[in-house]
């Protein structure tokens, strides 16, 4: 688990606009009183692969206010509203979804700040500020029973593990990149170092360094688990600013490059993630003007741009499921974000949320825990 961050129908949009809360409090706790029926209708025993937890707002871009909601979306596109906030500017922001599907983690920016943990099935909320005002990063695996958070330390991040009420449990050491990739078992995690990655126990003890030679200092990020014994990492080679993908064995064996070094002329300004689908190897890549692109890589390393219809060509891949990619993408030039499943081989689309052009739309979307989940 890597730790970081069709339009709504008229009925849902009306519900968001009409059922606003008037309580002075903010955060998840301010959003629970009127959503029990929707929460009660969730088939919790079916929540798993293919489900998505989404925070959506009908506020207009540019710092304007407007309501927001938290939705659980099934693989068939059914939406269940779990929370709502009257003012997006004061709402906590979704950070993570626990691997067991039971809890959501938010970062609070209003008031004294801090973090909130929402139990999705009951609406129970814990709000707290972690020691040192640490910033929440995500949940531990396999069940999400602890929180990982970080504090600035030199040019990197000091990591620690906390209880679900914010109590400090264990210091986890220093990270060069501030990213944490937990093994599915929860016994160890990977994070960045000055020369590649390192594998660390859940108790904070170094297991082994995983160097990736020929890379710039402090440039390697653990992206996700490629298989049970290999980490997919994005690193920047020396004498360039264009990231490259590497397969890094946790055994300490020599890493191998998954993608070749790119040049600006290729149109790929850096490989950030990858998915092996039945139809081929697909890459998440940086593009011009800070957009995200999707490429298909051939066996010889050459690439072909994948165009996602009805989007504004800034396509963030959240996960892969079967033959499809889950994509968060703007659908207008004003920055309105939507959510869809897309099959890059057939170009078939299944829109989960298609936001109107004049709203922010999908502010955050987190797929149910999977080794395929991206970490951008």
What do the PLM-derived regions correspond to, one by one?
Residues 32-81:
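An edge-strand/N-cap motif at the start of beta-rich repeat modules
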Residues 59-71, 112-117, 154-160, 194-199, ...:
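Structural motif
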